[in-house]
């Protein structure tokens, strides 16, 4: 057991030595080079992640990233406590992870990760783990917030880009938020289609290349403009790629700026030279919209990027086994050094300011 845990931690250390971390690097943690990983049980993997967190916090401070760190007792939950002698701040082994400030044990978190991997609805998660609906909601968004910056795969070759529109949503309980103001009139039933067009809809950018690499993010209210497109795709599109896009005029200066060839299609079913189209990106986008509308019964616009990163991860790991996907998500969320406290939820946003 100790050898398998040590091998797993060594593989994470090997990946961490790189300047940039790609999703494919995380996949390699479960690749053929780590043969003992196939024998890891649930308990061993939990111990491996705890040992890795402990080892990381003993090295550097998660706040100032300096190495002058000493042990400083234990928390009420018997977690090792540390003090940084440079910035004077205190932290424990779970600082800047989804488990930060959690009073539940790692076993219950591990079970929740299993439910996240299956995209289980919040109420079912709460019922199976005997936790409140509010806790299940917060855990989901803490995990999705952690994995979002880890999905950095670039796209190359022929890249399809489509935009799908969904109504702006203010779903949620706002009774305790005294500062909440809805910036539009309430949506009534049986409205005409023309009343939903324009700024009341939010665009989702869906990108996919022929190597199955994907990227998706919230665009803007209405159509996405050039500046927002460049902000989202500047570091995602490889130079000299071929862009197959919708009839949005913002892609013309984008292709010129990124030194890419552009095929701007007038219809979603148009095909140029029998190979340039956006049907794969369109299918990816329709899958996202259908899941949001019919499985989750709508998603608040402010949390939309969290769910898009979830779809991104599901699409990128669809060919991997269930156990491999579970370990990928656990590894990414622990390594990302991201935190989302309950008091931070009110500041979450997906649309540009």
Regions found by a protein language model. Name each.
Residues 1-353:
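Residue-level recognition of single "structural anchor" positions
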